[in-house]
Design a protein with these regions (language model features):
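Canonical alpha-helical transmembrane segments of integral membrane proteins
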Residues: 522-542
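Active-site catalytic motif of lipid deacylating hydrolases and related acyltransferases
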Residues: 2-74, 281-363
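Hydrophobic alpha-helical transmembrane segments
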Residues: 541-560
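Helical cap/lid subdomain of alpha/beta-hydrolase-fold lipid enzymes
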Residues: 90-272, 382-383, 391-522
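The conserved beta1-alpha1 loop
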Residues: 8-14, 79-80, 127, 205, ...
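Membrane-helix interfacial anchor on the cytosolic side
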Residues: 563-572
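Gly/Ala-rich beta-loop-alpha elbow adjacent to hydrolase catalytic centers
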Residues: 77-82, 86, 368-373, 377
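Short, hydrophobic alpha-helix immediately C-terminal to the catalytic nucleophile
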Residues: 21, 86-91, 377-382
Length: 572
């Protein structure tokens, strides 16, 4: 007897259920006793809907249909952004995970697995945006311009509404997208224990798709139940055009194969995974350490510290992998932009998700951050529920001194197990600039590299050891000098030493006098700098008005001056 099948078919961004008409026809042509559910989704161009809310509504919809339908199997399918929602729907149906809790819109109703989760046979992703979207060289010029303009308007809209448009919530590195990736990996890892979460996944991707790359499937290819099928002569949108033309029928055949082929047949006839995405998966890695550089820095030193940590771990029989990727040179002016800082946080969390995929047996992640590298983790811990690190080292921190570490240290399970924050004697970079933001009550960045963290002082946390290391002699990079590498490695591998302060660098008793004095009122430094910067335009105006300098000369000098300031601000 034929199985009674329910297919949940989800449209993509700016699309509507009726745009899936050809897809529905192709499904019904090869599956008997099938019901195709095509719900309308809040994915219009101007939508500001939370994707978690969309998935919550889908859960309720499937729950009701399951109660009345008596289905023998379920197939989840989606196009583009709809494929992301199909994956999230499956994750939510399989229940919450303690290390990657679902968002509040889903957590209250997803403590345990849904009864129908075990009946999900496969997911079929049509041009699924498994790694989100980003503007890069793969895009056509027209699409890149369209997305660039859209991002500008979306950011302006956020300033007015304080809500991100839906399209920006599924970009590469965004919280919803990254958390989905981590939730998926943990769900697949625990599928054998929970009895749900192991459905087949088939990705269909057009051969001329300029929005989704075959290499965007890292999270999926690390499992044995993922298969990849090329759709000939198809782009990101035209993959749905399964009309009566030759190309349309070829597309329909690929979809029908994805729906009906057995796992064994898919393994034979799908594209070889190592060619689609040559991911080097290492099952031997026990722990992973991130070593991330900061502003005004290319990060060449990160490999050296990471190597010291790997060697220390090897000496005690533990295998460490290292993540020392660079996000490029990041000058002072870009650092002052919250938009630029947010992009770097998204970069970090993209690397975090990739590391979970690449090292599936790793049980602990550690972090060593300097300058902006400290901000990246602090912000990631606030924005991403799936972010967990065991031991954390901050040097030259640009995080506010009142940052809430207790909530991370005391959460269950802990988001952070232990942390060291090195405070330097003469870190004028932090004392004069990020510290000024904290002095003025502006959140997000601050002077912990100069002040220390309030909650990490003795008595301010559960640890008997001081987590603020006061004071390392030197300036902004004092704690990452070679003399301190061994101490950093010892802490990451072994934890806080019982016999002393974990520092190989020279230590002092207080800040250097002038740094400490000027840091008492850092806005004075800014006012002095602004006065100096304003003096040149003032002199030019004086020359024009009193000494009758030529207008073209004054204009040229002013343009050259502003350009120089911009260049210097991006390099220092």
């Amino acid at each position: 007897m034929d199985k009674h099948t329910l297919v949940i078919l989800l449209h993509g961004f700016t699309s509507r259920p009726k745009d899936l008409g050809y897809v529905e026809r192709a499904i019904k042509a090869v599956i008997d006793r099938v019901e195709v559910l095509k719900p309308p989704l809040l994915l219009s161009r101007l939508s500001i809907a939370n994707p978690g809310v969309i998935v919550s509504h889908l859960l309720q919809l499937v729950d009701k249909r399951w109660e009345t339908g008596r289905y023998d199997r379920i197939i989840l399918a989606g196009h583009s952004a709809g494929a992301l929602l199909a994956r999230k729907l499956y994750i939510a149906a399989c229940g919450n995970h303690r290390f990657a809790p679902l968002e509040k819109e889903l957590a209250t109703s997803c403590g345990s697995a849904r009864p129908w989760a075990a009946y999900v046979e496969r997911l079929v992703l049509l041009a699924g945006m498994n790694n989100g979207w980003s503007i890069d060289y793969h895009m056509s010029l027209g699409r890149a311009l369209q997305y660039s303009v859209g991002v500008i308007f979306a950011q302006l809209g956020y300033l007015l509404t304080r809500r991100w448009p839906t399209i920006l919530q599924i970009r590469r590195g965004a919280p919803f997208l990254t958390e989905l990736r981590v939730e998926w990996l943990l769900m697949r890892r625990d599928a054998g224990i929970k009895g749900v979460g192991s459905a087949l996944v088939v990705q269909l991707l057009g051969t001329v798709d300029d929005l989704v790359s075959p290499r965007d499937n890292m999270d999926l290819v690390t499992g044995s139940d993922f298969f990849f099928l090329d759709v000939p002569d198809s782009g990101h949108g035209s993959v749905l055009q399964m009309d009566d033309s030759t190309r349309g029928q070829n597309r329909a055949v690929v979809l029908q194969n994805a729906l009906t082929w057995s796992k064994e047949t898919l393994a034979i006839k799908s594209a070889p995974i190592e060619e689609v995405n040559p991911v080097l998966v290492r099952e031997d890695v026990d722990e992973v350490v991130f070593v991330i550089h900061g502003i005004r820095d290319e990060g060449f030193w990160t490999d050296k510290i990471a190597r010291e940590i790997v060697m220390e771990g090897r000496a005690v029989g533990r295998t460490f992998a290292r993540e020392t990727s660079t996000y490029g040179y990041f000058g002072m002016f870009p650092f002052l932009s919250p938009w630029a800082r947010r992009k770097k946080v998204e970069w970090l969390m993209n690397k975090y998700a990739e590391a979970i995929a690449r090292y599936p047996q790793a049980t602990k992640f550690h972090y060593v951050g300097h300058s902006n590298g400290t901000y990246l983790l602090a912000r990631a811990l606030r924005n991403y529920r799936c972010c967990h690190f065991s031991r954390v080292v901050f040097a030259g921190s640009v995080v506010p001194s009142r940052y809430d570490w207790d909530s991370h240290l005391r959460s269950v399970p802990p988001r952070v197990e232990d942390i060291l924050n090195y405070v330097a004697t003469a870190d004028w970079v932090v004392a004069f600039f990020p510290n000024c933001f904290e002095y003025l009550g502006i959140p997000d960045i601050g002077g912990a590299g100069h002040r220390g963290f309030t909650q990490l002082d003795s008595g301010g946390s559960d640890s008997a050891q001081p987590r603020n290391i006061r004071y390392v002699v030197g300036q902004h990079s004092a704690a990452i000098r070679e003399s301190n590498w061994k101490a950093l490695a010892n802490f990451v591998v072994h934890g806080y030493p019982a016999d002393g302060i974990p520092s190989g660098a020279a230590t002092g008793k207080d800040h250097e006098f002038f740094v400490g004095l000027l840091a008492l009122c850092p806005p004075l430094i800014w006012l002095a700098l602004l006065a100096i910067l304003a003096s040149v335009p003032a002199l030019l105006f004086l020359g024009y008005s009193h000494y009758h300098w030529h207008e073209w000369l004054v204009t040229s000098l002013l343009i050259a001056y502003v350009s120089s300031i911009g260049y210097i601000g991006n390099r220092i």
